[in-house]
C-alpha cells in the first residue's frame, strides 16, 4: 500500500470514531412501508474524472452498493439522474426484492435544489430518504431512525447533525409538504438546501443519536476523488 493511500485511509478513520470497523454500519434494520429511498446520481463527477456512480467499488458499481443498503429499509427505490440512459440497466436489477426506477431530473437551474426537487417529485411514498450516490457506507439503520423521527415529530424533515455540520444528503423528508416548497425554491433558483430546511418544520438527529443508530459517523463519508475512492475500499 502506498504511503498516500495509507494516509487517506487513516484520515477516513480519524474523521469518524475509534470504534471497531465491524460496527461502522450494522446492517440490521426493519423495512418501512411508507419510505421511498432516492439515490441522487446527477452530478458531473468532475473531481473523479469519470462517472463515479458506475465505478466498481469492491467489485460492484458504487451505486449498486448504495441501493443494496437502502433496500433494507425502504419500500421503493428510485434513482434520479441527468443521464437516465446510462443507468437504465438498473431497472433490470433487483435489490432485496425491490426494482429501482430510474428517473430524469426535472427541468430547472442546475444545482442542489434541482436534485432535491427531482427526488421529492419522483418518489411515490409519503416519506423520502434522499442519499447521494457516492456514500458507500450509508447506514440503513440511520435512515430508519430518521424516518421514525419524522413520523413521531411530526416533522417535515429530519436531518443528521454532527460536529462538521448538517448532512442534508442523508436526510428523510415528508413528500407532501417538502416537494412543493422545493419546486418553488428551484423556480426562483434558490439552490441552498438550507433554504428548504428553514422553510419547513425541521428536526435533527445529533451526533450521539447518529452513533447509536449507525455505529459511527463513517456513514456520511463520500468519495469525490480517485484517492478517496481507493481509501474507502480499504475500509469496506
Locate predicted features.
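Low-complexity, intrinsically disordered regions enriched in charged/polar residues
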Residues: 4-6, 97, 223
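Hydrophobic alpha-helical membrane context
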Residues: 12-13, 20, 146, 186
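Nucleotide and nucleotide-moiety/phosphate-recognizing core
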Residues: 29-193, 198-218, 233-234
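Low-acidity, Ser/Thr- and Arg-rich intrinsically disordered low-complexity segments
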Residues: 2, 6-18, 25-26
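Short, basic/aromatic-enriched C-terminal tail that caps enzymatic domains
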Residues: 219-236
Amino acid at each position: 500500500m502506498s504511503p498516500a493511500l495509507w494516509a487517506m485511509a487513516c484520515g477516513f478513520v480519524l474523521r469518524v470514531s475509534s470504534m471497531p470497523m465491524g460496527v461502522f454500519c450494522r446492517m440490521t434494520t426493519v423495512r418501512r412501508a411508507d419510505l421511498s429511498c432516492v439515490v441522487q446520481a446527477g452530478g458531473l463527477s468532475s473531481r473523479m474524472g469519470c462517472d463515479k456512480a458506475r465505478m466498481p467499488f469492491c467489485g460492484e458499481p458504487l451505486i449498486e452498493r448504495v441501493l443494496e443498503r437502502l433496500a433494507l429499509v425502504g419500500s421503493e427505490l428510485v434513482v434520479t439522474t441527468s443521464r437516465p440512459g446510462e443507468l437504465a440497466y438498473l431497472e433490470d436489477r433487483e435489490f432485496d426484492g425491490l426494482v429501482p426506477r430510474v428517473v430524469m431530473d426535472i427541468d430547472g437551474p442546475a444545482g442542489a435544489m434541482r436534485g432535491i426537487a427531482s427526488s421529492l417529485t419522483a418518489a411515490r411514498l409519503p416519506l423520502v430518504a434522499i442519499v447521494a450516490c457516492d456514500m458507500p457506507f450509508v447506514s440503513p439503520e440511520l435512515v430508519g431512525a430518521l424516518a421514525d423521527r419524522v413520523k413521531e415529530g411530526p416533522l417535515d424533515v429530519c436531518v443528521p447533525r454532527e460536529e462538521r455540520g448538517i448532512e442534508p444528503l442523508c436526510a428523510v423528508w415528508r413528500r407532501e409538504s417538502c416537494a412543493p416548497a422545493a419546486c418553488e425554491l428551484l423556480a426562483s433558483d434558490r439552490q441552498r438546501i438550507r433554504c428548504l430546511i428553514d422553510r419547513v418544520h425541521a428536526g435533527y438527529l445529533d451526533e450521539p443519536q447518529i452513533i447509536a443508530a449507525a455505529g459511527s459517523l463513517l456513514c456520511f463519508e463520500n468519495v469525490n476523488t480517485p484517492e478517496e475512492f481507493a481509501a474507502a475500499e480499504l475500509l469496506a
